[in-house]
């Protein structure tokens, strides 16, 4: 596989999760109606069930890939994803749909864990950074265009057409893997699965104040993101009577998150992870409090919501990758297991918090905005816990690096 094809392949792997979530959003009302859901908020389970499967499976794929190799484990994950998509196409009840979506998440988790592992196997240093940067640029476009893809499908086909698209996406990736991706993990580098070793690594992760603090802070802000994703379609349709603007505004908000991620990549080496992420957290918290005040005063409209939400997502993009990196700093010697545990906790915890926010949707933006503010305060508390009450400190790292 040549360099360009490899970059596109990694980008496609990274995009699997985002497209499986964001393309669903315009179809949630139709799915709820077709499967006889009695409460509109319950349609959000289409998102949450996927996230729970995605989060839970992250805990196992790293160890499996280190033991059995990248290619075979990736093939299994993509097969689960594709078969689950077929199950969703033919789902005749909401319960079957939830099971199919959870299995989709289980399959998609393989792409999330293995994308970085495969790049690490094949490249190192600047070349690895170049591959990840190029793939990340492609990946950032997916949340921007995925809702519009879903909207186009439901305009010209039944909502099940979205799952046909996801099935084809998974099948193409599976065939691509089978035909073009060799095994990237050398046999001598394979490691046996050790319960004792995994338990020891978990103990190291949970014993680190910095790791636990940033893991929980990341869970809080992920909860806000998932709450927004869960209820965004209903907010535009019911709170603002502007369903026709949903995909456009959602894309614009996603652009701000993409821009902040690109900005972070440019400045973090010079400014430092802590300065960037702590400033972003304070900005995020300030915006959430302003937004809560706007809603409480009764002057909320689609423009105030969209502008303030874009500001929050901009801050989000400056926080999350840095929170993850700082959580990993003390446990780099058990990076694989630590990364799996971080992904498990932040995704499962964030999905559950986001589900609670979404289920409290009452036709207004009040639950979401006050939830954002509460989660922002808790994220600050956890960061202060990690940093022993001090923000912007470098912990003795080289200047501009932390």
For each feature predicted by the language model, list its residue ranges.
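Helix-breaking motifs and short loop linkers at transmembrane-helix boundaries and internal kinks
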Residues: 69, 90-96, 107, 124, ...
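Paired small-residue
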Residues: 80-87, 95-103, 303-311
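Conserved MFS/SLC helix-loop-helix module at the cytosolic interface between two early adjacent transmembrane helices
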Residues: 55-95
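Juxtamembrane intracellular "pre-TM" segments in multi-pass secondary transporters
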Residues: 182-214
């Amino acid at each position: 596989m040549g360099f360009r094809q490899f970059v596109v392949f990694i980008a496609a792997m990274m995009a699997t999760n985002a497209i499986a979530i964001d393309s669903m959003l315009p179809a949630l009302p139709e799915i709820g109606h077709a499967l006889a859901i009695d409460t509109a908020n319950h349609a959000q389970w289409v998102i949450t069930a996927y996230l729970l499967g995605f989060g839970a499976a992250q805990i196992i794929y790293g160890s499996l890939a280190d033991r059995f190799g990248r290619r075979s484990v990736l093939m299994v994950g993509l097969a689960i994803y594709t078969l689950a998509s077929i199950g969703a196409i033919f789902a005749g009840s909401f319960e079957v749909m939830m099971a199919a979506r959870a299995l989709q998440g289980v399959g998609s988790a393989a792409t999330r864990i293995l994308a970085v592992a495969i790049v690490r196997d094949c490249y190192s240093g600047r070349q690895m950074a170049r591959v990840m940067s190029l793939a990340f640029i492609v990946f950032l476009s997916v949340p921007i265009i995925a809702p519009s893809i879903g909207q186009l499908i439901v305009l010209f086909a039944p909502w099940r057409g979205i799952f046909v698209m996801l099935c084809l996406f998974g099948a193409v990736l599976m065939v691509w893997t089978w035909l073009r991706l060799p095994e990237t993990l050398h046999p001598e580098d394979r490691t046996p699965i050790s319960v004792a070793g995994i338990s020891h690594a978990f103990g190291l992760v949970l014993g680190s104040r910095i790791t636990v603090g940033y893991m929980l802070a990341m869970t809080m802000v992920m909860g806000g993101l998932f709450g927004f994703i869960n209820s965004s379609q209903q907010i535009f349709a019911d709170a603002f009577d502007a369903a026709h603007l949903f995909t456009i505004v959602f894309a614009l908000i996603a652009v701000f998150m993409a821009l902040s991620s690109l900005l972070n990549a440019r400045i973090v080496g010079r400014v430092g992870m802590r300065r960037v992420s702590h400033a972003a957290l304070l900005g995020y918290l300030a915006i959430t409090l302003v937004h809560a005040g706007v809603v409480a005063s009764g002057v909320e409209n689609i423009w105030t919501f969209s502008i303030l939400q874009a500001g929050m997502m901009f801050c989000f993009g400056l926080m999350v990758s840095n929170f993850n990196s700082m959580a990993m700093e003390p446990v780099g010697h058990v990076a694989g297991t630590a990364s799996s545990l971080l992904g498990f906790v932040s995704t499962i915890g964030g999905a559950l918090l986001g589900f609670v926010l979404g289920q409290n949707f009452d036709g207004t933006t009040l639950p979401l905005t006050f939830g954002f503010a509460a989660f922002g305060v808790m994220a600050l508390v956890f960061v202060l816990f990690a940093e022993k009450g001090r923000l912007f400190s470098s912990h003795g790292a080289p200047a501009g690096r932390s």
